């Protein structure tokens, strides 16, 4: 399982950090959630700079996403990848559905 944390750094920019579940046992325990929503994005669909609206898991079920960060880097994630979105402030990030398939995600807002 691959989990990537998307968070706001002290520089006000969003950053990515790979989380190893073996080193983060809290990821392997039951976490309270508010529900689940399924979303679909057609290939090429782009969302300009934005923040995560709340702490949430975003799991790509189908297709691929490209996440853009303030340092100019682009990162691609495909089916089965889990993002823990925690960049609630600062510059935020961009997202684009890439590849030939639509992107289908399951978003699980966390209860804090």
Which sequence ranges carry the predicted segments?
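Ubiquitin-like/PB1-type beta-grasp interaction modules and other compact soluble beta-rich domains
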Residues: 2-3, 54, 73-76
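A short hydrophobic beta-strand segment most commonly corresponding to one strand
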Residues: 84-88, 94, 98-112
